[in-house]
């Protein structure tokens, strides 16, 4: 459960971080 959450965070932080950077730049 904890390991799955860690792997999920790793995958989603990479996509989410890049997504927020791109979307944030475009939005602003």
Curated annotation (Swiss-Prot):
It is a lipid-anchor. GO terms for cellular component: plasma membrane. It is found in: Cell membrane. Its EC number is 3.2.1.4. It is an enzyme of class 3 (hydrolase). It catalyses: Endohydrolysis of (1->4)-beta-D-glucosidic linkages in cellulose, lichenin and cereal beta-D-glucans. The keyword Membrane applies. GO terms for molecular function: cellulase activity. Keywords: Carbohydrate metabolism, Cell membrane, Cellulose degradation, Glycosidase, Hydrolase, Lipoprotein, Membrane, Polysaccharide degradation, Zymogen. The active site is at residue 20. Signal peptide: none annotated. The keyword Repeat does not apply. One of its GO terms (biological process) is cellulose catabolic process. Belongs to the glycosyl hydrolase 5 (cellulase A) family. This is Endoglucanase. It comes from Schizophyllum commune. The lineage of its organism: Eukaryota, Fungi, Dikarya, Basidiomycota, Agaricomycotina.
